[in-house]
Regions:
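TRNA-recognition modules of translation machinery and tRNA-sensing kinases, especially anticodon-binding
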Residues: 1-221
Length: 221
């Protein structure tokens, strides 16, 4: 992976963001070559699905009101469990820390993760100490607000593009003259406040998405 990341960087495909100010993990820039590749991939994807007569393209906002994401379950359930090192303050995904000791670490509860970390004497990858806070859930969405001061509404940067298509379902249903099936596709940015982004571009805090939602009548698919 490190060799691939180094090659992409040298060739101007993908580079670390804000590097002259120390960089920010989980954020990348697309260089001259990477930007062209990305544009062509997106255009090809849209062209492919656009050939289907009952699939349309939409474009919805990156900022999503809290009420939408409460209804979708993201506010309560869009979490990863985090373990913080008391010695140096570094934070890591708990399931990543125990991945060598359990086949399905993402299924473990916070208490089970704590027990496994203690049993195996897992050391902090940053400082090599064994001194952990209890694992706790961390919501992965970036929170913001809409409006000024007292009149503001809680909102989030969207964790995925799907909600925009679901919100437009009534309008799309009218567009297709109240007939199913039909589909909506969307490309754009998604945002997830990853606890410990790593592995190059596999876990990013801001990333490109391409999604298609296809709506059918379950009684007459």
């Amino acid at each position: 992976m490190s060799r691939l990341v180094s090659l992409l960087r040298r060739r101007g495909v993908v580079l670390p963001s804000f590097e002259i100010y120390g960089g920010v993990s989980g954020l990348v820039d697309y260089g001259p070559v990477g930007a062209r590749i990305k544009r062509r991939v997106i255009e090809s994807w849209i062209e492919h699905w656009g050939r289907i007569t009952n699939v349309v393209e939409i474009d919805s906002p990156n900022i999503t009101p809290e009420s939408v994401l409460i209804a979708s379950g993201h506010v309560g359930e869009f979490n990863d469990k985090m373990s913080e090192c008391l010695a140096c303050g570094s934070a890591f995904r708990s399931d990543h820390l125990v991945s060598d000791f359990h086949e399905a670490p993402d299924t473990l509860s916070s208490s089970e993760l704590d027990e496994l970390i203690e049993e195996e004497g897992i050391r902090c990858p940053s400082c090599d100490k064994v001194d952990w806070k209890e694992a706790m859930p961390m919501n992965l969405m970036f929170q913001t607000s809409i409006g000024a001061m007292g009149g503001s509404r809680t909102a989030f940067l969207r964790p995925e593009t799907a909600q925009g298509m679901f919100m437009l379902f009534p309008a799309l249903y009218r567009h297709f003259r109240q007939k199913l099936p039909f589909g909506a596709m969307q490309t754009g940015k998604g945002y997830r406040n990853e606890i410990s982004p790593r592995q190059g571009m596999i876990r990013l805090r801001e990333f490109n998405m391409a999604e298609l939602e296809y709506f059918i009548d379950p009684d007459d698919p």
